[in-house]
Amino acid sequence: MTAETVALSAPNDSADGTGLPVRPLPIGAFPLPLGYLLVPAGADTEAARLDLLAGRLPTTWPDRMAAHRLVVEGDQDAALAALTGDDPVSRFNRFVLDPAGGTPETLRADLGELGVLVDVVAFTVGVAAEPPVDGAATGEVGALVLCARATHALADGDAAGAVDLLDAAVSLCEGSTPVLAAVLRGAAAGAEQQRAATPTDGVVDRLEAALRGLDEARDMRVARSETHLAAGLALHEQGRTDRAIPHYHAALRLVTSAEAPLVWASAHANLAAAYLTAPMTQASDQLRTGIAVQSLRSALTVYTRADHPTEWASAQLNLANSLVYSPSTHQADNLVEAVELYEEVLEVRSRDEDPMGRARVLANQGNVLAHLGMFDVAKAKLYDARFVFEEFGDVEAVRTVRGVLDEIARQQALRRSED
């Protein structure tokens, strides 16, 4: 059953716009504030309501939805100023844009069966500390009540309870508002992963079901991209990189760095990590390393040392490692850049806070310096790394560093014999 067929079963014939909105309401799927603005009833707004239900922005906004249009354009002050009516829908929409104004008690009463949405909005924007409880709310309204309660449960550490609430929310609205149900499935996947402390098959199933529900929601590209990224990360952590990679690519096709910079950067960084860890079975697979290098460079246009230190350091380190092994006609230049990248990472990898992480960077940097023939500097880095590995009992790492040091000794002996 589609959103359109459900909507058409309830004719929208309140032309003056003073009555309550026609259900199902297109709420909850788009992000705040647009996602909670009610659509005034009337023949002039019906096409827009159906578009929003399907996850699409209207190509033409009716005059009575000027506030919605202005919100989409990013002018919330103008949107608030456009809501001059005293009918319940206009007052509710003003409350969404300015929760500090108005009288919630009167508004709640005037909205009738939709009154609980006042409490949903108040909780969602942080005005109310507790979520509403309304067992009589149905459909998409009841789903949003349960979603608010799930958010509260997660904040209290009750991930299992949140999963149950979100599953119940999906059941309430999947027949009438499938796009909202898809968004809630994605939220349930996140709660399930938090409950299990790992991405289970159930997490992946929920995310892929959410993506199917969002497939035609053309103007919810950020939500679709976020869901693809979440699915990719879950599959990647399960070791199924072959299935994770298409999700990362899909996430990148949907958004730009300007629209969703952190989603875009994360998709690039994790796509690179997937390519770098995937087994290489044929010569053409080496091209993946070059793609990984480009993706990491892209991620680092968003991740900065000041604003995203953890992600920045990870991308820097992976880029350095990629440059070492990437096939190139400028291999020496790549190695020099890798040494510099390692040095920048070492500046934020404290010996006290992350001794083993720092030691691994030192070992990698020492190895590259050795390949560049800078043996004395390389040995200093490698000795430092070996000391930490020995202290923490990492026998394999100690053996690897000793192997590099032995090779340096052989190369230095060879140089002396040639002199």
Which ranges hold each PLM region?
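Conserved alpha-helical positions within TPR/SEL1-like repeat arrays
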Residues: 144-155, 180-196, 222-237, 262-277, ...
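TPR-repeat structural position
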Residues: 76-77, 104, 159, 197-200, ...
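TPR/TPR-like (Sel1-like) alpha-helical repeat modules
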Residues: 85-89, 109-117, 288-297, 336-343, ...
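Amphipathic alpha-helical segments of tetratricopeptide repeats
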Residues: 167-172, 208-216, 249-257, 293-305, ...
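Structural motif corresponding to the intra-repeat A-B loop/turn of tetratricopeptide repeats
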Residues: 73-74, 101, 156, 195-197, ...
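Structural signature of alpha-solenoid helical repeat scaffolds
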Residues: 137, 175-176, 219, 259, ...
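Flexible inter-repeat linkers and adjacent short helices
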Residues: 1-230, 407, 411-419
